[in-house]
């Protein structure tokens, strides 16, 4: 069980999600605590229950296939793939943002330079392709590097809440607002929107623990018990990280495309006018650039995982067998990898056309999260719909947890068409998100039924 606690923290905590919470100001504390209660704990309960019923079938795809049928299982996998594809497609935008902060104020123009972002997108996906083709030999070191940098930056952010690099008795640090507030938040449409994004984005991912269910003694109970330990730790980490951002950046000016580079740039900004080298400033900028490299490393791992989905779909006869062929030298699905990289590159270039970086990031993030939301809706529906067919009926509290998870997920999906940054047209933003989401799922349904038709012939 104790191995599952750090695993849950690493899978759930994302260093960028504190930026969304920081938009709420000091009352973010209440939002994180509510998100733990209404999403994280229900998620842990449902994942633990499913892992207990199907202890050797790690993953939402298999649970949905057994409980609700092959179509539900396929749409789970399809929407997870859509989310992963869109998650990595913003690599050019995020890298440009990191570099603009890492090089200092004179490089601020980089963040919204469409040509440069397009160049970053193409070059970085070529790097990701090169890393993934040889397989796990290189990929595991890329993964270790990304994880190490994430942990380092998380600890650094929490440290910056208590230590201000350029503060002195003569020039003490002054927070732009209170990092924490015990006052009740004002409930508006925007604050509810922010809450759903905090909960859904910041606290999802726990279901990936189920991959190891077959290697865990009494997996269902172990996952639930470890979640009770991990939950308060995750809450403290997120609250401290968000408070750290608010100690340096006004809530209204938080940059959602790069909140971590932004806070590092603000915290380590030059504090003296002397001609000597400002090592604090150099450290901050170096950390920003290393974080950009780590982001590419993390996205390379996501591409590696996602590239196996077309291969498995090919084995099941859903798509052409062309995707299932392995490279004779590396024994990796090079064709699937190439297709995933090509699609992600195209989506990344398309999303930035005619919009600023903030709006493009929101469009990509929103469409991807619609896919992840459908994935979660199917998962939370399992305890409510499976009955006693597998020998275990979900009890009252388990069903209540499933309903809570369903409600938060559905609310988060409804708010995905509403931007939380300034956009040229809210109606155009909503139309782009809704239209792209419908098109993605229509394509998934068409592929499934075409595969079933061919399998019957």
State what each model feature region is:
Residues 62-64, 69, 101-106, 226-300, ...:
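TM-loop-TM module centered on a large, flexible mid-protein loop between adjacent transmembrane helices
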């Amino acid at each position: 069980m104790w191995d599952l606690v750090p695993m849950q923290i690493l899978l759930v905590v994302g260093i960028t999600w504190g930026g969304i919470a920081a938009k709420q100001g000091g009352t973010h504390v209440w939002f994180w605590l509510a998100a733990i209660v209404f999403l994280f704990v229900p998620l842990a309960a449902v994942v633990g229950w499913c892992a207990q019923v199907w202890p050797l079938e790690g993953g939402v795809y298999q649970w949905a296939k057994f409980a609700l049928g092959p179509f539900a299982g396929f749409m789970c996998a399809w929407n997870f793939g859509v989310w992963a594809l869109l998650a990595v497609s913003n690599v050019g935008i995020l890298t440009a943002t990191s570099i603009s902060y890492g090089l200092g104020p004179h490089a601020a123009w980089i963040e919204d330079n469409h040509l440069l972002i397009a160049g970053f997108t193409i070059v970085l996906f070529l790097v990701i392709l090169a890393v993934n083709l040889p397989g796990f030999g290189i990929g595991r070191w890329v993964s270790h590097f990304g994880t190490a940098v994430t942990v380092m930056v998380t600890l650094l952010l929490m440290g910056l809440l208590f230590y201000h690099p350029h503060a002195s008795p003569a020039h003490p640090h002054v927070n732009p607002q209170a990092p924490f507030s015990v006052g009740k938040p004002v409930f508006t449409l925007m604050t509810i929107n922010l809450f759903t994004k905090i909960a859904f984005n910041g606290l999802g991912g726990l279901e990936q623990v189920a991959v190891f269910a077959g290697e865990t003694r009494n997996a269902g109970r172990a996952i639930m018990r470890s979640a009770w330990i991990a939950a308060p730790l995750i809450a403290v980490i997120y609250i401290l990280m968000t408070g750290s951002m608010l100690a340096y950046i006004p809530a209204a000016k938080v940059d959602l495309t790069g909140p971590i580079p932004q806070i590092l740039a603000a915290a380590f900004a030059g504090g003296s006018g002397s001609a000597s080298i400002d090592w604090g400033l150099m450290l901050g900028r170096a950390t920003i650039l290393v974080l950009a490299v780590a982001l590419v490393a993390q996205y390379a791992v996501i591409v590696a995982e996602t590239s196996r989905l077309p291969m498995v779909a090919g084995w099941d006869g859903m798509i052409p067998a062309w995707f299932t062929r392995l490279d004779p030298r590396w024994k990796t699905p090079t064709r699937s990898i190439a297709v995933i990289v090509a699609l992600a590159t195209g989506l990344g270039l398309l999303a930035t056309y005619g919009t600023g970086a903030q709006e493009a990031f929101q469009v990509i993030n929103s469409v991807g999260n619609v896919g992840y939301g459908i994935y979660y809706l199917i998962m939370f529906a399992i305890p409510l719909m499976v009955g006693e067919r597998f020998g275990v009926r979900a009890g009252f509290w388990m069903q209540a947890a499933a309903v809570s998870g369903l409600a938060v997920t559905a609310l988060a999906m409804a708010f995905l068409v509403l931007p939380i940054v300034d956009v040229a047209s809210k109606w155009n933003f909503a139309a782009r998100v809704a239209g792209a989401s419908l098109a993605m799922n229509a394509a998934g349904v068409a592929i499934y039924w075409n595969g079933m038709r061919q399998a019957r012939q």
